[in-house]
């Protein structure tokens, strides 16, 4: 469908997210404006937009590992963190539980992005279901291009372990999140 339709689809999904957040029922800990605020902070200038700007500015230029982590923290990781935090807030999570969900989302989001970078250089387009090597073609910084494939795999494994560890306070009651991590990370 092309880039234009993809941008419009993203816009539609974002506005739908705000619509749903606005319709969410308050809990005794979280009010409707908490849900909308969480989404707005994630989609706004300090998170998603900042990460995308850094990503676009880095194309075709040398990017440090710290800059790449910044991009991933403000894009993929921020979106996944927001998703699990909103779920926790809707379930009336305690502050401790919400912090565990925040940690999980952060680590699973970073791990997902590192794994995506690895797959982009190790699998074919047919295996990926999308164009392989696209990042390299536009000289986009990735973990394999900065630290190599072996180190990227180690980083992904460490982040994955941290994501699973973040769920320990739930003592087996986070089966759906564990399944999400299994799906995203394997």
Could you describe each region identified by the protein language model?
Residues 1-168, 175-185:
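Mg2+-dependent prenyl diphosphate-binding active-site environment of isoprenoid biosynthetic enzymes
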